[in-house]
């Protein structure tokens, strides 16, 4: 890494995650307890990989209860009941042990007795009702520990509504039907589409992200961004934007991304002259955008594929242009703020050479390339497994130039095994990939010069398992919400009531949906937020004429920006803790920087060509991109108050208004927007030339 980039202490980073990221709020373990927990996490991740590759033919009645049961088991061992318990080293109270094994018992009972339960259908007996209630309560308690109270409140309200609806229809069977639908029915409830997607795809991508992090790709991305923009105006802030966008490809957590890259970029931004609030806000805004950055988007994107029936690969393609616009907006804000403050870039001699860096470390991108290629031919889960395999393979590349046999030869062994098993012997793809993974791990015992080692493999699997628990719990809880909506036809009722009221104003419907997503996102994880909004508000937007993908992308975007929207802006708070800035001011500044996230969804909702939907021509798409970028530039200039020099207040209003007019895709609004932006820009340009001419004389 370039020596110009200073970072905070690793212990400080861990402490920040412990405070702000619930996935890091685990027990304090040392010695044998820590080793035992690591073994459990490794077994958990291995089970997920084996279920995806080797025993993929198992029925959902087996896979899903086993997955949820194991998740709750390790979850109760990871997350203590209270902050007081978390402060005590190696403390496992008896009730946590009981809850952990009770989780295994209840959910494994379902897997073992699946045939009997299927035959019973909604005529389940007292035993099944009691076990179902216990299973739901176990999930709720772990949700309290791992995700927080707000999601429980939301789920509780929906459950009460479901119970009331069933009681009105038939009081005698209300409890039985409620438990059956929420716990045993695979079409709604805990085991519905959210947890199915989590078990099939999301966990595998989380494990992939953990392995990519271990390869050192994060450091490579920071250096790559530094080589691209480090020497330009406000270079360190631009480095933060680019590196966070790249890191977002494998990090699904805004907070973790902010803390991880922010520990490097924020101190550097402060050093060159950026205010602490601005430095923290840049990192928070860019890191939050990581969840919309293809090819590995946030967990909610996989749920979108399942709910809409649109292939994940198509969603990734549709997300490209909005992501480009989002980060372009932040980049322009940073650029004009840097010009306003007169900030220069980093010294050129401290910046890595772009092509030398690619030649040295470009191979770290191979797993990402493999992932993109595989998505065109295989399921998302299988594609993730291929990428995990190649993460292991590239990690076998040695750093000892004098031992070429091991440096180059070892990575070729698992690759050769894959080719022979898959293409020569013709065994099934999943088994071939799994055996090749095992061979790669065995090869790690034969070298000390490579990144890959048995310890790194264990850490990668452990990290993937630890990060999966909170997401899986949120998916299971979200399933309860979607189950109630499906069971009671609440979604259809809301569409019938709201659409006529909002028919006259599509902007009003979009604005109300935006507010609902942001408010809900302040207390509910992105995954659950998306499921709730996709179940309730997306159908309303679709009924009003917005295309399916555009409606779901709209709620997806606004569920994410809650991480930087005050008063509950966890990513902004994480950045402020590193920068030692005011958290509220940081959140407000981050919201200003990420203004694109509040504008872009309106653009693709009103003109879905931005998502490659019904594109009239390539030129029409280029026109949308150009006007959108000009609009983002106008807003950036208006908000920073600087183009070539200070911009008067009335011109700032013109620039902001011009950017807003360019949201509407009609030719008239585009012309007005271009004029409103063009006049102040031309005035600034002419004034700047006069000043230069005067200075030259």
Regions found by a protein language model. Give the residues of each.
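Conserved, well-structured core domains of diverse proteins
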Residues: 1-122, 129-133
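Long, contiguous bundles of hydrophobic transmembrane helices that form the permeation core
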Residues: 2-37, 42, 317-466, 570-660, ...
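Membrane-water interface regions at transmembrane-helix termini and the short interhelical loops
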Residues: 51-56, 77-89, 116-117, 135-149, ...
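Hydrophobic or amphipathic alpha-helical targeting/insertion segments
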Residues: 100-105, 113-116, 124, 129-184
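Membrane-interfacial loop-to-helix junctions in multi-pass transporters
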Residues: 126-130, 188-201, 227-241, 272-278, ...
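Core transmembrane alpha-helical segments of multi-pass membrane transporters/permeases
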Residues: 141, 145-146, 150, 154-168, ...
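Transmembrane alpha-helix interface/packing and boundary motifs in multi-pass membrane proteins
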Residues: 209-213, 244-253, 285-291, 482, ...
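Hydrophobic transmembrane alpha-helices that form the pore/transport pathway of multi-pass ion
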Residues: 222-290, 296-303, 309, 526-558, ...
């Amino acid at each position: 890494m370039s020596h110009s980039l200073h970072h905070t202490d690793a212990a400080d980073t861990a402490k920040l995650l412990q405070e702000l990221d619930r996935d890091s709020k685990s027990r304090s373990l040392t010695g044998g307890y820590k080793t035992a927990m690591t073994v459990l996490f490794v077994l958990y991740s291995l089970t997920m990989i084996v279920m995806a590759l080797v025993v993929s033919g198992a029925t959902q009645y087996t896979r899903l209860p086993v997955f949820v049961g194991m998740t709750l088991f390790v979850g109760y061992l990871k997350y203590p009941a209270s902050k007081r318990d978390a402060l005590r080293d190696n403390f496992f109270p008896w009730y946590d042990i009981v809850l952990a094994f009770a989780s295994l018992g209840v959910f494994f009972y379902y897997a073992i007795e699946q045939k009997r339960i299927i035959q019973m259908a909604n005529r389940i007996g007292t035993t099944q009702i009691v076990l179902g209630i216990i299973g739901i309560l176990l999930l709720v308690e772990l949700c309290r520990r791992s995700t927080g109270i707000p999601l429980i409140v939301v789920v509780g309200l929906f459950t009460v509504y479901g119970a009331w609806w069933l009681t009105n229809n038939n009081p005698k069977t209300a409890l039985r039907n409620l438990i059956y639908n929420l716990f045993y029915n695979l079409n709604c409830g805990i085991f519905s589409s959210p947890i199915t997607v989590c078990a099939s795809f999301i966990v595998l991508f989380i494990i992939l992200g953990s392995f990519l992090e271990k390869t050192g790709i994060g450091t490579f991305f920071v250096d790559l961004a530094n080589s691209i923009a480090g020497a330009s105006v406000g270079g360190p802030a631009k480095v933060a934007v680019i590196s966070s966008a790249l890191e977002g490809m494998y990090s699904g957590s805004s907070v973790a991304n902010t803390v991880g890259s922010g520990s490097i970029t924020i101190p550097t931004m402060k050093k060159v002259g950026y205010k602490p609030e601005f430095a923290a806000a840049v990192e928070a805004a860019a890191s939050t955008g990581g969840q919309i950055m293809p090819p590995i988007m946030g967990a909610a994107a996989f749920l979108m594929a399942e709910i809409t029936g649109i292939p994940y690969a198509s969603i990734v393609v549709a997300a490209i242009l909005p992501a480009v616009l989002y980060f372009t907006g932040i980049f322009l804000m940073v650029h004009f703020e840097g010009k306003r403050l007169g900030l220069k870039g980093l010294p050129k001699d401290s910046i890595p050479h772009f092509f030398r860096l690619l030649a040295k470390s470009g191979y770290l991108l191979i797993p990402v390339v493999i992932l993109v290629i595989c998505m065109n031919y295989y399921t998302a889960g299988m594609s993730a497994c291929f990428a995990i395999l190649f993460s292991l393979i590239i990690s076998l590349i040695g750093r000892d130039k004098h031992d070429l046999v091991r440096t180059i030869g070892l990575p070729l062994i698992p690759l050769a095994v894959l080719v022979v098993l898959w293409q020569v012997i013709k065994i099934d793809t999943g088994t071939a990939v799994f055996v090749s993974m095992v061979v790669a791990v065995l090869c790690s015992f034969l070298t000390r010069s490579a990144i890959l080692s048995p310890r790194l493999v264990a850490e990668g699997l452990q990290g993937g398992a630890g990060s999966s628990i909170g997401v899986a719990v949120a998916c299971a809880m979200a399933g309860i919400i979607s189950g109630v909506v499906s069971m009671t036809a609440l979604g259809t009722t809301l569409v019938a009531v709201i659409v006529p009221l909002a028919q006259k104003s599509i902007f009003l419907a979009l604005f109300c949906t935006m507010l609902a997503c942001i408010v809900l996102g302040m207390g509910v994880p992105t995954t659950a937020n998306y499921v709730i909004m996709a179940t309730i508000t997306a159908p309303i937007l679709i009924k009003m004429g917005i295309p399916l993908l555009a409606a779901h992308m709209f709620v997806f975007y606004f569920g994410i920006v809650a991480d930087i929207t005050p008063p509950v802006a966890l990513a902004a708070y994480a950045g402020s803790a590193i920068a030692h800035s005011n958290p509220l001011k940081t959140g407000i500044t981050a919201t200003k920087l990420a203004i694109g996230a509040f504008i872009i969804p309106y653009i693709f909702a009103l003109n879905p060509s931005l998502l490659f939907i019904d594109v009239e021509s390539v030129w029409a798409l280029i026109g949308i991109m150009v006007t959108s970028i000009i609009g983002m530039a106008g807003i950036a200039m208006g908000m920073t108050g600087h183009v070539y020099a200070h911009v008067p207040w009335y011109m700032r209003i013109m620039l902001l208004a011009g950017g807003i007019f360019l949201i509407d895709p009609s030719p008239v609004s585009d012309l007005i927007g271009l004029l409103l932006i063009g006049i102040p820009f031309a005035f600034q340009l002419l004034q700047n030339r006069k000043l230069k001419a005067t200075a030259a004389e």
